[in-house]
């Protein structure tokens, strides 16, 4: 019932934002900024990149509001945009590092500067138990195609159908990736325990 009210509110805000109401768009941002940040942070494990994804997501939402199909859930549409931006960043992030710290072909840049930082906050370390930490590390090490579905399924509590809608893939593909993702996790965690 609350989901229906939220959908109605979102639909109303989208209609107003399409007409140029900046306050309505600001409310959309308020409704989703934390959700998109958590999704992006779980997928990218980098606070700064997650913040960039949030900004890019809302920029794309604003530019493409006229393309949003009101027969679909707004949350699915915005999660798809955020997820796709994360996937794009993960693809671009493929490591291409030299074993040597100093690289002669790039002035002033050494190999250490190219390694992405791990910007986890102290409160994150306090909140995460040892077991959760191991699971999180195992999820981080998953290949991107499994990591995405595992984050959406287990950390964002999305149904298989919702994940299918967000990633624009058949439900059977999502089921397969969830199953294989679980197998990867099981094998990684068995080695650690």
Where are the regions that the model predicts?
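Internal acidic/polar
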Residues: 6-7, 96-125
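Arg/Lys-rich amphipathic alpha helix in sigma70-family domain 2
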Residues: 66-70, 83-101, 180
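DNA-recognition helix of helix-turn-helix
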Residues: 76, 87, 134-138, 146, ...
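Sigma70-family region 2
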Residues: 18-19, 45, 58-73
